[in-house]
């Protein structure tokens, strides 16, 4: 079985990944800078509560779901190209774990190391299961955790499985033919996300993580964001946005780690660490996204992979992969 992802399909996934990366950066930057969430009297700042409803919990599920899709595509590629496909997957996850371990020294709470561990513990065994079982486990894992634990990183394994099941069901292969289905999901997800977002906003900020409000609103918001973006990418104005997001998505690993370095370098010099200036912190986030978008686009004119993506790929296939750009389209995994 081989999912040969066509140009439109992979470009759409890259754009969605780039979109998720931007949203995660906004959330990560206020965590890294430790920006104040309350005023001097201990009352939560309205802007923090509003930004939480717009950003927090919305982009992490997208990234996790895409991780499961990527695992499925890599598995297909490994089965085609290697006599020991599971060893290929193990190397990829171990390499990600090492990168995550180093990254965690600078950004505690980062996602790469948990992704690698969950991939080894859950995705690898799940790859041997029938797809209906993977889908069922993904649904139970995602929504069960959302209701019982209130979300967070615990949602990742279920979302991994949903991504794996989606790719194995052939939906990724036929994404460009599913415009009406995407529109139907968006039409249902958007009002549901708005209702859930109002529920989250009306829940006292300091009580959010003891209720399922964040997880439920986050999952519905993520679904509305993704389907809305996919619809936007199919019309002419969306192509401009796609040109910005795709390079960011192709270099997602490099940009995710690189953003941490840029935040740690810039925040103290700009006096943002521990401050209450959300405008300045959000301005820094926009600046980092702009710099990374330009650098990613320029880099991809010369090279096939980002720096960390290239290292990751070399370890995955246990060979030195050519990095210079050629006329022959590269494989996504």
Language model feature labels by segment:
Residues 2-333:
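Alpha-helical transmembrane segments and their immediate juxtamembrane cytosolic regions
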């Amino acid at each position: 079985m081989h999912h040969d992802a066509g140009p439109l399909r992979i470009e759409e996934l890259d754009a969605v990944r780039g979109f998720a990366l931007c949203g995660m950066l906004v959330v990560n930057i206020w965590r890294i800078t430790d920006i104040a969430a309350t005023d001097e009297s201990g009352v939560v700042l309205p802007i923090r509560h509003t930004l939480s409803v717009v950003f927090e919990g919305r982009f992490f599920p997208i990234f996790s779901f895409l991780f499961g899709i990527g695992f499925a595509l890599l598995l297909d590629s490994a089965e085609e190209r290697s006599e020991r496909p599971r060893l290929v997957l193990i190397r990829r996850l171990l390499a990600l774990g090492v990168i995550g371990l180093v990254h965690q020294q600078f950004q505690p709470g980062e996602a790469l190391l948990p992704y690698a561990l969950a991939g080894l513990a859950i995705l690898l065994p799940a790859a041997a299961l029938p797809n209906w079982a993977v889908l069922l486990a993904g649904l139970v894992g995602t929504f069960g955790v959302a209701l019982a634990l209130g979300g967070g990183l615990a949602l990742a394994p279920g979302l991994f499985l949903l991504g794996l099941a989606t790719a194995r069901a052939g939906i990724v292969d036929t994404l460009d033919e599913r415009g009406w289905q995407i529109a139907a999901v968006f039409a249902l997800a958007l009002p549901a996300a708005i209702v859930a977002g109002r529920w989250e906003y009306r829940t006292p900020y300091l009580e959010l993580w003891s209720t399922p409000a964040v997880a439920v609103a986050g999952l519905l918001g993520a679904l509305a964001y993704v389907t809305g973006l996919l619809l936007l990418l199919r019309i002419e104005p969306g192509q401009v946005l796609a040109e910005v997001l795709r390079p960011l998505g192709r270099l997602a690993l490099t940009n995710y780690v690189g953003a941490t370095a840029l935040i740690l370098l810039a925040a103290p010099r700009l006096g943002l660490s521990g401050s209450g200036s959300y405008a300045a912190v959000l301005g820094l986030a926009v600046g980092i996204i702009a710099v990374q978008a330009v650098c990613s686009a320029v880099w991809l004119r010369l090279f096939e992979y980002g720096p960390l993506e290239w290292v990751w790929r070399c370890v995955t296939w246990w060979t030195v992969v050519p990095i210079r750009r050629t006329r022959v389209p590269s494989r996504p995994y």
